[in-house]
């Protein structure tokens, strides 16, 4: 069985997702900040965190990752290596937003299109989703028809392309080839805001007409 709790974190209200199976094997996706809040939820639910996953290297998706890696003693997977400069420059990027400097770190494992992540009974397939950032990836659970797609597609909107190596044309191509090929009832968990479905965005998203 698939279990999901979204924990809004950071001043950016980023959707940190905690996912677990019936045996309480868990993964945390995009721990953007507020590590104590995430740890408290995990402990309350008595979850066994096995991996930390990252869709992309923007600060609001990674500021708590290194702290959680040390706390849970687990490996970090993702994003694609094209986002490496964002991890290396994290302290400076934090300060440019007027935030306390989070230490630079690198994931233990970069991920590529076609890779798979297994957490207990759950399997996530990796797709490369460039456009918002060059190394952006998504985690797709085809059995449960749910995708954790970071800041690529939102309800009625799309990701920014004015940040490091963002590209509007590439983002639109990514959405149409890597998300809109899914079934209409496939659920999209974005990096910010409420969830949506592929079918809804095909019909109503003004950026994708």
Question: Which residue ranges define each predicted feature?
Answer:
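Short Gly/Pro-enriched turn/cap motifs at secondary-structure boundaries
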Residues: 7-8, 107-108, 128-130
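Metallo-beta-lactamase
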Residues: 93, 122-209
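Active-site HxH/HxHxD metal-binding segment of metal-dependent hydrolases
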Residues: 34-117, 204-207
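Short, glycine/acidic-enriched loop or turn micro-motifs at the edges of active sites
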Residues: 24, 33, 59, 83, ...
């Amino acid at each position: 069985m698939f279990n999901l709790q979204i924990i809004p974190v950071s001043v950016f209200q980023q959707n940190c997702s905690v996912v677990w199976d019936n045996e309480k094997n868990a993964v945390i996706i995009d721990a953007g900040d507020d590590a104590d809040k995430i740890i408290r939820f995990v402990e309350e639910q008595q979850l066994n965190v096995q991996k930390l996953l990252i869709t992309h290297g923007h600060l609001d998706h990674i500021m708590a990752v290194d702290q959680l890696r040390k706390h849970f003693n687990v490996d970090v997977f993702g994003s694609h290596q094209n986002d490496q400069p964002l991890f290396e420059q994290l302290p400076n990027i934090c300060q440019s937003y007027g935030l306390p400097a989070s230490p630079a770190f690198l994931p233990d494992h970069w991920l590529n299109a076609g890779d798979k992540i297994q957490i207990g009974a759950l399997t996530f397939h990796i797709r490369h989703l460039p456009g918002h950032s060059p190394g952006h990836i998504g985690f797709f659970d085809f059995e449960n028809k749910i995708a954790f797609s970071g800041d690529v597609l939102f309800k009625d909107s799309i990701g920014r392309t004015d940040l490091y190596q963002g590209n509007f044309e590439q983002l639109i191509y990514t959405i149409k080839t890597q998300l809109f090929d899914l079934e209409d009832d496939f659920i999209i968990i974005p990096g910010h805001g409420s969830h949506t479905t592929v079918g809804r965005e095909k019909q109503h998203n003004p950026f994708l007409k």
